[in-house]
């Protein structure tokens, strides 16, 4: 049978004298197509959950998060007892923390900002470290009090005591006198070569660079080094930090090093001399840097390893790695 409404041949059993209007609930003038038979007879979609139902789900998740944190605390309590008999030294584990933060960023998805997730985990790590072995954060405020406080609170929270200092050497000296404290000092600029105090054996060392997850709009973007004492087995050595003292330091030698490494340079007491803090990645070496200095007309007076840290994990502003 030929349908005037659709211009197609329809099976006889689909039409009756009243079809398609009566049989399929169509209004006169409404076009008819076989596909409409399915759409008109399909079930309505299920109603969305109510606000109350969603709030119950959220409350349940919040309770689970709290329960898991308490369970983590129970494990830390057992860990403390084990460490009292099996381990000596600081509770900081820079290599483990770096691995944990990388995995956190890689698996993160959804609308929750990465900033929030990163800060929550940093505070969890710092607080449980503090519970294991109480420590204080000694911060050099000479680079800007507000930015340094933001960095300290973002990465260590409010449970860990915060102690202000007004030059980096004072912060490092306080850590040297302590049992397990740490210092935060600028990673990009300084007026004094504070890292010289890290050269001797047994002194504190650079153990981390923050923020570890680096992006342009980071809420605690001030680059800082973390200085403390940790077990050699706990260190991460992806980037080595070297204290290098040179003579013949000038703009030409600085330009010669810029493609090879990040450098903080401070003039020292020697004529045309400088104390350098050099970041040596796996893509280069101290020998290459020394050769570049010599080729540029400088001479190396001494060098000493003063710490190491993880390679920074860079993401875009929207959180993509």
What are the residue ranges of the model-derived segments?
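Domain-level signature for soluble enzymes in the chorismate/prephenate branch of the shikimate pathway
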Residues: 2-4, 14-16, 21-321
């Amino acid at each position: 049978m030929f349908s005037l409404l659709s211009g197609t041949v329809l099976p006889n059993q689909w039409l009756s004298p009243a079809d398609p209007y009566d049989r399929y609930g169509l209004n006169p003038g409404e076009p008819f197509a076989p596909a409409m038979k399915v759409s008109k007879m399909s079930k309505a979609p299920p109603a969305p959950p109510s606000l109350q139902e969603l709030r119950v789900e959220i409350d349940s998740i919040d309770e689970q998060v709290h329960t898991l944190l308490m369970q983590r605390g129970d494990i830390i309590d057992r860990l403390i007892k084990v460490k009292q008999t099996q381990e000596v030294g600081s509770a900081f584990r820079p290599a483990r923390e770096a691995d944990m933060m990388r995995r956190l960023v890689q698996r993160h998805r959804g609308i929750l900002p990465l900033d929030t997730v990163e800060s929550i985990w940093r505070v969890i790590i710092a607080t449980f470290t503090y519970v294991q072995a109480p420590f204080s954060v000694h911060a050099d405020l000479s680079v800007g009090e507000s930015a340094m406080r933001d960095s300290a609170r973002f990465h260590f929270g409010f449970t860990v005591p915060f102690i202000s200092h007004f030059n980096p050497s004072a912060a490092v000296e306080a850590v040297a006198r302590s049992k397990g404290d740490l210092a935060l000092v600028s990673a990009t600029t300084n007026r004094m070569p504070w890292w010289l105090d890290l050269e001797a054996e047994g002194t504190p060392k650079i153990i981390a660079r923050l923020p570890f997850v680096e992006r342009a709009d980071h809420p605690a973007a001030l680059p800082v080094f973390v200085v403390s004492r940790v077990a050699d087995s706990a260190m991460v050595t992806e980037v080595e930090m070297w204290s290098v003292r040179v003579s013949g330091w000038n703009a030409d030698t600085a330009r010669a090093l810029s493609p090879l490494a990040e450098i903080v340079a401070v003039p020292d007491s020697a004529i045309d001399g400088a104390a350098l803090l050099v970041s040596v990645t796996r893509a280069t070496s101290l020998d290459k840097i020394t050769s570049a200095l010599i080729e540029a007309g400088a001479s190396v007076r001494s060098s000493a390893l003063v710490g190491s840290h993880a390679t920074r994990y860079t993401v875009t502003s929207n959180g993509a790695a």
